[in-house]
UniProtKB/Swiss-Prot annotation:
Pfam families per UniProt: Antimicrobial_2
UniProt source species: Odorrana grahami
Name of the protein described by the UniProt record: Esculentin-1GRa
Location(s) in or outside the cell: Secreted
Family indicated by similarity: Belongs to the frog skin active peptide (FSAP) family. Esculentin subfamily.
Keywords attached to this entry: Antibiotic, Antimicrobial, Secreted
Predominant localisation class: secreted
Gene Ontology BP terms: defense response to Gram-negative bacterium; defense response to Gram-positive bacterium; killing of cells of another organism
GO cellular component: extracellular region
Function as written in the Swiss-Prot or TrEMBL entry: Antimicrobial peptide active against the Gram-positive bacterium S.aureus (MIC=12.5 uM) and against the Gram-negative bacterium E.coli (MIC=6 uM). Has no antifungal activity against C.albicans. Shows hemolytic activity against human erythrocytes only at high concentrations (LC(50)=210 uM).
Tissues where the protein occurs: Expressed by the skin glands.
Length: 46
């Protein structure tokens, strides 16, 4: 029915937002790690 359609959409949106947020957090960690590694390679401290 209409309600289940709406609920499904809401749940999908929540999951999508959650995944986007987690992706952003993980992405930031990866970027930070990458910057750290690049920095120590440049300085020769790895």
């Amino acid at each position: 029915g209409l309600f289940s359609k709406f609920a499904g959409k809401g749940i999908k949106n929540l999951i999508f937002k959650g995944v986007k947020h987690i992706g952003k957090e993980v992405g930031m960690d990866v970027i930070r790690t990458g910057i750290d590694v690049a920095g120590c390679k440049i300085k020769g401290e790895c």
